[in-house]
């Protein structure tokens, strides 16, 4: 009767470590050895003894019942049966007891020689090919050359069978009988045994020293990299010494996982469904047993070797079947799922079972609208509620003494007897439920509601909660979850109740904004109508106005005068006479008086502002009531107004025909120009598109005027549009204007869609012709296809964002940093995209901000910038404010509250423990789907805005030019003008009186300038204009043109137009890279003045030998044709930025300020040389196919692109530094979202970018433990440098016994040691100062950054699971469970919000008790003081 020990793992652990398992450990955790491949007896269905399901090893199949049936029942618990050897215990031990298989020969673990980087290969310095040939028994490897060393045979040499036998023949007789430890013995083996011996003999310290030396001193870069790679593996093993030994990468004992985790289920018909693992284990056991027998009967070496190879292969496929070239397949030709596969991917252990579990106490059903619900309520069907709250009802039934046992109570509930409804009402009070709608893209996808029981089978949802859930009632389903514990109920009520979540965490705007019918109703009753009944009446107060309306004396839209309560300048509520309408009075009955009197027409936009104001003035609770009032009023009025529309409400403007006619005439004109040869085909196309775009937008404007003046603007269609209830200008334009230009379907992989130049002239009311309809279908279908594809992308983006930022939590109040970001208005040319007010609101200022004119302190350093302060700053002349930002936060873990600023969901400073990283990821990911879903609304309509090709003065101002280079010309009208020939020219408009810069514009190269530097211009004056359709190259000198390298059909082709017979020279990319087309300008005498390169695709507009004047165009390069706007800008661009990828055609960027000289042409690249004033020279190669943006002698700044294309983030980081690249990424991503009209606060992007910039790469390791080129965390880097700061490195140990050369010691220890040596007159220790490491900041894409986090659990559950675990095991990594994912995987509370680790230690007690403890403490202290 032996007893087994219980080893339960505690669940309150705080760290998880991973490492290689030693054979001893596997044995210790095993409950017995599996000897037979049998699983269960097919007749009795009982497990076979010693087989894969053996009860003796893994435990009984039935609770408390042994195999032979001698012991049954719980009273024999813990007894081991003497007949069958099964311990009598619960059957659930079969989920946790492991077994093992003792292998006859060791095998190599496939993870460590098949996956890259090849660990065993790097340790031994063997290439993968050679390693394979050893492991799979093709070659012998020399482990110890012994006496054969003089014959030139060295360790690690590979021998074929013949060579090996030859050597054996030449060995001295007794050599093979020597001990293995004898250095003279010749040893060579094959297979994993050989590798085991080699690994066991490694001296890691010596190897590390040698590799470090090689990495530091080797001249060849390749060998250096090789050494560094090997060094990394060696260092991992040295760092995890004691936990990991290299030889443990060779498996001698295979663990067998518990049988319940690889079940065998009998199906009907005598067949079995089994886990693939059983097959894989079975093959291992069969081969292992066969090998045992072959060795016993002393089979020939060849047979044994084959069997050993097969054993190695079967263990390989058990561990990782997908790694192998020939995966083991089932009969159906499906590869078997191995142990690694069960961890990988969406269906793997991590993502399927640990991060997302199905839970009980849940239900789901279709949702319907519940307009009479309050903001915090939802309707739950009776039957669903009875099932969800079942245990609660049973408890109450027993408490009330209605039934005695649980079983009978269950029956009553199942029969749905009337008594339970009363109890259910009682139970549901104060017991909220959580509603969730998939996909849960942000935290508002799960909210808590107070349930109400309703008849029917559908869940009722409050209409205002729809926006947050992104729900509609066309058949959406939602899931209900029940929080059980008191803590959960409390959190649901306090934090998650729908009426508390009115603000959107992404941007702080209200998210519960009434939509559709509600908006329409409110808009309708707040609209004024001239000449309505009772116009001009005056009332003494709202009551009288309402009485008059109810009596039918005054119309709801009539403009009347009423004395109402409103706010004066100081914000006090006073009675004022206002011109208003009865409708507005009705609305203001609901609005809280603190907000004042709302005397405007209410649209969706203004409603959002009103709700914001109500929240600020009255708090969340009153806002929820206000929203309910607004909802009821809106529905009621939309119903009373009868706001439907008919065909007559869709008005087609009379002017349409004339406009279209004019369009046709203009197009004819363009075509005749083309036929006469004045313009190229490309220009013709661009101009035609332009004409129709103009016609369309003009028609739209006329249409809007027409429809808005119809019936005083009470046209139903117009009201729906204007109130923001439904529809857009685009849609109305297509209903009653014209559909306009359409995009052409493009071939797969071709560049963006061209636009069909014949527009659709009809609208939907007139109906489309067959051809028009056909053209339309393409857009509509493309829209649907895009949507389906892009939704998946958006989801994946969200997942990567969460993974990179889930461990960013507010961990402290103030990190004490002195750095910040400088914030200004964000401008694009002239228009302000984001005001300073928006950008600094709710942030913390770094310095005191003082009003420059009055000198008053607006905000102290370290204080939050509130609405009032931000407004004051915006109104003052202050241009920029330095604010705290997460990008500059210096917290060790997470970020601090001051650097984050305000929590947008509450409008207060963020609290400790807020999971800001996840919020940021959700805020960016959630609109991602909108980025995608916005395409097809345009129906593929090509919105190509007419090109803007001039600079016009917007105000009276003085002009200042920078970097301006021009040549004088006479333009086509005969006016004198200048042509700009510099690339960096800028013009500043300066206010004549104040000297403030009003705006700055780039003056493009090749534009015609009509003003002089310093000139004062009137408003509306044309400053400059340029050709919108072509980029040009202009001569700066007058002279004769001579072409070089311009050869027909080599570097140019001639396009002639059939219609016009006009011929054009177009430069093409030549196969012969030595021929470079260029144009020289010569003087009369034939001296060279200037040379211009002719770029590929340029149209040459002059002849060879022609005379040109300065300022004349020699080449036109047609700009890319107007492409149809599609999302592809959207999501892929965001991904590209967050992944820090280099754009497809990166620009070549100058790294220094300096002067440009053109070099020679090398291999199809033009060399550009930049020389700085200090004499530094940088050379760049630009492919000839690219247009070069600089000319000879131009002066460029660092960061100026030398060729066309986009600048890469890596270049920005290298040249302009981290701050510049951070701002660049944040602003670029913001641009994509802004374009879609999505508002997201900057701080969310900052958090993601902070996570992308966490790592540095080591340049010089100095005396630290880092390696060159190693990527480490900034924090780790700083800590390591701090650790060796001020310490000394021993150069010569002298006569010291304690210190060795190369050791790092503190100054104090050194002093003690040297004084001791001095006393004994011995040679002292010589030292030098320790050298710190140096590093370079790097930018990582979010995927890389997520895989590089300190937590291996988080990384493994993200992507590349096997690789991550593989690395982690070798490094012996320890996961401190600091992020969210790790804790969810372990089943712990997340370390954020109420689960913040500080709160664990808090003891909650009563105040009196606390006071009593304090009093006692005082007396104790006094007593001590007396002594």
Curated annotation (Swiss-Prot):
* Swiss-Prot/TrEMBL GO biological process terms: DNA-templated transcription
Q: How is the cofactor bound?
A: Binds 1 Mg(2+) ion per subunit.
Tell me which residues bind Zn(2+) 1. Answer: 66, 68, 81, 84
InterPro entries in alphabetical order: DNA-dir_RpoC_beta_prime (IPR045867), DNA-dir_RpoC_beta_prime_bact (IPR012754), RNA_pol_asu (IPR000722), RNA_pol_N (IPR006592), RNA_pol_Rpb1_1 (IPR007080), RNA_pol_Rpb1_3 (IPR007066), RNA_pol_Rpb1_3_sf (IPR042102), RNA_pol_Rpb1_4 (IPR007083)
What reaction does this catalyse? RNA(n) + a ribonucleoside 5'-triphosphate = RNA(n+1) + diphosphate
> Per the record, a Pfam family?
RNA_pol_Rpb1_4
What Enzyme Commission number(s) appear in the record? 2.7.7.6
Binding site residues for Zn(2+) 2: 815, 889, 896, 899
Q: Keyword set for this entry?
A: DNA-directed RNA polymerase, Magnesium, Metal-binding, Nucleotidyltransferase, Transcription, Transferase, Zinc
Subunit details: The RNAP catalytic core consists of 2 alpha, 1 beta, 1 beta' and 1 omega subunit. When a sigma factor is associated with the core the holoenzyme is formed, which can initiate transcription.
Q: Which HAMAP family match?
A: RNApol_bact_RpoC (MF_01322)
Name of this protein: DNA-directed RNA polymerase subunit beta'
Gene expressing this chain: rpoC
């Amino acid at each position: 009767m032996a007893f087994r020990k219980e080893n339960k793992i505690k669940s309150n652990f705080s760290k998880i470590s991973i490492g290689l398992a030693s054979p001893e450990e596997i044995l210790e955790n095993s409950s017995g050895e599996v000897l037979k491949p049998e699983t269960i007896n097919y007749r009795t269905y009982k497990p076979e003894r010693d087989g894969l399901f053996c009860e003796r090893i893994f435990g009984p199949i039935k609770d408390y019942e042994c195999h032979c049936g001698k012991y049954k029942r719980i009273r024999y618990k813990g007894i081991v049966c003497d007949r069958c050897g099964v311990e009598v215990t619960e059957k659930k031990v079969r989920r946790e007891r492991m077994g093992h298989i003792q292998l006859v020969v060791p095998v190599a673990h496939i993870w460590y020689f098949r996956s890259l980087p090849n660990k065993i290969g790097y340790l031994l310095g063997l290439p993968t090919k050679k390693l394979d040939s050893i492991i799979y028994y093709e070659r012998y490897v020399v482990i110890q050359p012994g006496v054969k060393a003089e014959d030139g045979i060295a360790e690690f040499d590979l021998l074929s069978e013949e060579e090996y036998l030859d050597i054996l023949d030449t060995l001295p007789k007794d050599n093979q009988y020597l001990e293995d430890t004898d250095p003279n013995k010749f040893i060579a083996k094959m297979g994993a045994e050989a590798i085991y011996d080699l690994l066991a003999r490694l001296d890691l310290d010596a190897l590390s020293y040698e590799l470090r030396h090689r990495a530091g001193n080797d001249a060849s870069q390749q060998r250096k990299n090789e050494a560094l790679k090997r060094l990394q593996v060696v260092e991992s093993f040295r760092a995890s010494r004691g936990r990991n030994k290299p030889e443990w990468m060779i498996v001698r004992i295979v663990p067998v996982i518990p049988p319940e985790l690889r079940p065998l289920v009998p199906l009907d018909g005598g067949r079995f469904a089994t886990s693939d693992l059983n097959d894989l284990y079975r093959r291992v056991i069969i081969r292992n047993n066969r090998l045992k027998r072959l060795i016993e009967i002393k089979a020939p070496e060849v047979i044994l070797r084959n069997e050993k190879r097969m054993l190695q292969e079967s263990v390989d496929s058990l561990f990782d079947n997908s790694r192998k070239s020939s995966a083991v397949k089932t009969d159906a030709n499906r590869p078997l799922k191995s142990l690694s596969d069960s961890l990988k991917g969406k269906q793997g252990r991590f993502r399927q079972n640990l991060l997302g579990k199905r839970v009980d106490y849940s239900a789901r059903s279709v949702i319907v609208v519940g307009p009479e619900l309050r903001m915090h309520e939802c309707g739950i069907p009776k039957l669903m509620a009875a099932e969800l709250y079942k245990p609660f009802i049973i408890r109450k039934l027993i408490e009330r003494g209605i039934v005695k046992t649980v079983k009978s109570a269950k029956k009553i509930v199942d029969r749905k007897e009337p008594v339970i409804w009363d109890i259910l009402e009682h139970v549901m009070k104060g017991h909220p439920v959580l509603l969730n709608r998939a996909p849960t893209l942000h935290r508002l996808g799960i909210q808590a509601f107070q349930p109400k029981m309703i008849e029917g089978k559908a869940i009722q949802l409050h209409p205002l909660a729809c926006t947050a859930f992104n729900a509609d009632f066309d058949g959406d389903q939602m899931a209900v979850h029940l929080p059980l514990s008191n803590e959960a109920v409390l959190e649901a009520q306090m934090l998650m109740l729908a009426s508390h979540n009115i603000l959107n965490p992404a941007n702080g705007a209200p998210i519960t904004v009434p939509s559709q019918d509600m908006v329409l109703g409110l808009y309708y009753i707040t609209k004024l109508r001239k000449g309505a009944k009772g116009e001009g009446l005056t009332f003494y107060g709202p009551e009288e106005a309402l009485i008059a309306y109810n009596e039918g004396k005054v119309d709801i839209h009539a403009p009347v005068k009423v004395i109402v309560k409103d706010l004066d300048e100081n914000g006090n509520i006073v009675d004022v006479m206002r011109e208003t309408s009865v409708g507005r009075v009705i609305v203001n009955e609901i609005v809280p008086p603190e907000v004042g009197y709302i005397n405007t027409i209410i649209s969706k936009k203004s409603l959002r502002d009103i709700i914001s104001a109500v929240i600020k003035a009255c708090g969340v609770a009153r806002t929820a009531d206000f929203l309910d009032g607004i909802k009821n009023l809106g529905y009621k009025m939309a119903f009373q107004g009868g706001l439907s529309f008919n065909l007559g409400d869709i008005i087609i403007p009379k002017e349409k025909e004339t406009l279209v006619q004019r369009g046709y005439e203009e197009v004819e004109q363009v075509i005749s120009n083309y036929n006469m040869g004045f313009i190229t085909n490309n220009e013709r196309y661009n101009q035609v598109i332009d004409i129709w775009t103009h016609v369309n937008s003009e028609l739209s404007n006329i249409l809007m005027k027409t429809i808005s003046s119809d019936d005083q603007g009470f046209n139903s269609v117009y009201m729906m549009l204007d109130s923001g209830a439904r529809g857009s200008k685009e849609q109305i334009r297509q209903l009653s204007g014209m559909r306009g230009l359409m995009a052409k379907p493009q071939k797969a992989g071709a560049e963006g869609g061209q636009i069909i130049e014949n527009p659709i002239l009809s609208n939907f009311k007139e109906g489309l012709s067959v051809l028009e309809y056909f053209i339309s279908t393409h857009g509509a279908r493309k829209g649907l296809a895009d949507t389906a594809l892009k939704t998946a992308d958006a989801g994946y983006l969200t997942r990567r964002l969460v993974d990179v930022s889930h461990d960013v939590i507010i961990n402290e109040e103030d990190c004490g940093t002195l750095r910040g970001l400088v914030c200004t208005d964000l401008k694009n040319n002239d228009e302000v995209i984001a005001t300073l007010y928006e950008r600094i609101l709710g942030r913390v200022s770094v310095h005191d901000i003082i009003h420059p004119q009055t000198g008053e302190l607006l905000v102290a350093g370290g204080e939050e910038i509130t609405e009032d302060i931000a407004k004051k700053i915006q109104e003052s002349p202050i241009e920029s404010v330095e604010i705290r930002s997460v990008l500059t936060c210096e917290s060790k873990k997470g970020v601090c509250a001051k650097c984050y600023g305000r929590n947008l969901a509450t409008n207060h400073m963020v609290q400790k423990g807020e999971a800001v990283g996840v919020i940021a990821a959700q805020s960016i990911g959630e609109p991602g789907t909108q980025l995608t879903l916005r395409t097809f609304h345009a129906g593929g309509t090509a919105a190509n805005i007419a090109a803007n090709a001039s600079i016009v003065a917007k105000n009276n101002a003085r002009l200042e030019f920078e970097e301006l280079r021009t040549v004088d010309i006479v333009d086509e009208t005969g006016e004198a003008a200048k042509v700009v020939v510099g690339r960096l020219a800028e013009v500043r408009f300066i206010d004549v009186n104040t000297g403030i810069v009003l705006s700055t514009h780039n003056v493009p190269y090749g534009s015609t300038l009509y003003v002089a530097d310093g000139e004062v211009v009137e408003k509306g004056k044309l400053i400059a204009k340029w050709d919108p359709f072509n980029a040009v190259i202009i001569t700066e000198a007058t002279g004769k043109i001579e072409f070089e390298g311009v050869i027909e059909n080599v570097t140019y082709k001639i396009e002639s137009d059939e219609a016009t017979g006009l011929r054009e020279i177009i430069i093409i990319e030549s196969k012969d890279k030595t021929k470079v087309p260029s144009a020289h300008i010569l003087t009369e005498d034939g001296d060279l003045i200037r040379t211009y390169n002719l770029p590929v695709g340029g149209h040459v507009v002059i002849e060879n030998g022609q005379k040109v004047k300065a300022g004349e165009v020699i080449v036109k390069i047609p700009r890319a044709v107007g492409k149809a706007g599609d999302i592809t800008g959207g999501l892929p661009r965001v991904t590209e930025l967050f992944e820090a990828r280099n754009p497809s055609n990166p620009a070549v960027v100058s790294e220094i300020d300096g002067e440009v000289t053109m070099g020679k042409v090398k291999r199809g690249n033009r060399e550009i040389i930049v020389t700085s004033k200090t004499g530094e020279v940088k050379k760049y190669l630009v492919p000839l196919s690219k247009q070069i943006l600089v000319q000879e002698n131009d002066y460029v700044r660092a960061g100026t692109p030398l060729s066309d294309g986009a600048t890469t983030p890596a270049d920005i980081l290298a040249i302009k530094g981290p701050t510049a690249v951070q701002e660049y990424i944040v602003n670029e991503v913001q641009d994509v979202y802004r374009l879609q009209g999505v508002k997201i606060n900057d701080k969310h992007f900052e958090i993601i970018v902070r996570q992308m910039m966490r790592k540095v790469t080591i340049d010089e390791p100095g005396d630290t433990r880092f390696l060159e080129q190693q990527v480490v965390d900034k924090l780790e880097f700083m800590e390591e440098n701090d650790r060796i700061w001020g310490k000394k490195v021993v150069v010569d140990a002298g006569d010291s016994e304690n210190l060795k050369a190369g050791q790092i010691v503190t100054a104090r220890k050194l002093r003690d040691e040297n004084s001791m040596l001095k006393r004994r007159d011995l040679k002292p220790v010589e030292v030098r100062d320790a050298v710190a490491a140096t590093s370079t900041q790097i930018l990582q894409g979010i995927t890389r950054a997520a895989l590089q986090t300190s937590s291996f659990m988080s990384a493994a559950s993200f992507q590349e699971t096997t690789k991550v675990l593989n690395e982690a095991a070798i490094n012996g990594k320890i996961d401190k469970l600091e992020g969210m994912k790790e804790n969810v995987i372990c089943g712990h509370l997340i370390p954020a919000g109420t689960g913040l680790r500080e709160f664990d230690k808090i003891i909650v007690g009563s105040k009196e008790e606390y006071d009593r403890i304090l009093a006692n403490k005082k007396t104790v202290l006094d007593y001590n003081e007396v002594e």
